[in-house]
């Protein structure tokens, strides 16, 4: 599947760039899990784009962090094509994208992510 397939399937999609070895990514993940649980029935989706190199570490982190949304990785680390396409130079990084592909917000975390979703999902 392509990123555009996930985006077209939801009213809003969070593209979450992360990696199993990224401490700040792991710390933020409970906020992302909570947002997904709260808003997925209202047309909110997430697709994770991992900057991992090791498939086992990546899969273990998905399980350990209770990540239930689709995940993608080319296992190329910082050479990830998706990261290059969206200009991601540090993680965690997020893009909130509308159904038509418009970037609505970048790098929302914690309360900022919740506030933006509450505004959009009225």
What are these regions (language model features)?
Residues 1, 20, 56:
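Long, positively charged binding patches that form subdomain-scale interaction surfaces
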Residues 1-13:
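A short beta-strand-turn-helix
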Residues 9, 54, 113-115:
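Extracytoplasmic and endomembrane cell-envelope/extracellular-matrix remodeling and assembly machinery
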Residues 10-13, 18-21, 28, 90:
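Short pre-active-site segment immediately N-terminal to redox-active cysteine/selenocysteine motifs
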Residues 16, 47-50, 72:
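Short beta-strand segments
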Residues 27-65, 77-84:
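Structural microenvironment flanking redox-active thiols in thiol-disulfide oxidoreductases
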Residues 65-67, 74-121:
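Thiol/disulfide oxidoreductase modules built on the thioredoxin-like
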């Amino acid at each position: 599947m392509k990123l555009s397939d996930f985006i077209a399937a939801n009213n809003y999609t969070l593209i979450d760039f992360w990696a199993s070895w990224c401490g700040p990514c792991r710390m933020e993940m409970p906020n992302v899990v909570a947002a997904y649980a709260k808003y997925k029935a209202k047309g909110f989706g997430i697709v994770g784009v991992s900057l991992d190199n090791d498939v086992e570490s990546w899969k273990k982190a998905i399980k350990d962090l209770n990540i239930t949304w689709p995940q993608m990785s080319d296992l190329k680390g910082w050479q990830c094509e998706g990261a290059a396409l969206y200009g991601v130079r540090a993680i965690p990084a997020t893009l909130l994208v509308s159904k038509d592909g418009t970037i609505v917000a970048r790098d929302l975390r914690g309360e900022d992510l919740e506030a933006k979703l509450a505004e959009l999902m009225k």
